[in-house]
Amino acid sequence: MSDKTVKSTNLMAFIATKMLERQEDLDTCTEMQVEKMKTSTKARLRTESSFAPRTWEDAIKDEILRRSVDTSSLDKWPELKQELENVSDALKADSLWLPMKSLSLYSKVSNQEPNSIPIGEMKHQILTRLKLICSRLEKLDLNLSKAVLGIQNSEDLILIIYNRDICKTTILMIKSLCNSLI
């Protein structure tokens, strides 16, 4: 069993546990996906156990020790997103990769006020960019709604519904920001 696979399993166990601790931030669909990721990770641990016997708790402890930082908040790990980008191909092939990758949406809530926009950039330029982003997100949401018609399995349907929710929430946030800039 490669070290990279073990680290990926540790990371999956750690993220599933931390996301489930923040259940109030999760919608039902995401919570189901995280539970499924937890089940999948436990299955991977059983597969790995013939090489290095470990429990769910061992995998989480290994990840905490590897990090050697305060584990009280996911907000304190800017390197987590980069780590998720560098995990093994086996993990990227997992259908639960998207909810893990979208974890950054839960950990990077910004309270920055519109009046703290960097000096040198005019509001109309910012508004134009935000409106362009919003229109692209609306197009993505439309394409996702069309994709639902051709879905054969429930896992893909859950992922599409989850990503549509993210699109809609982001669109609303951008429109709210645009209104506050006007």
Curated annotation (Swiss-Prot):
Subunit organization: Interacts with protein M1. May interact with host nucleoporin RAB/HRB and exportin XPO1/CRM1.
Keywords: Host nucleus, Host-virus interaction, Transport, Virion
Family to which this protein belongs: Belongs to the influenza viruses NEP family.
Compartments, as annotated in UniProt: Virion; Host nucleus
The protein's name: Nuclear export protein
Gene: NS
Superkingdom, natural source: Viruses
BP GO terms, sorted: exit of virus from host cell nucleus through nuclear pore
Signal peptide: none
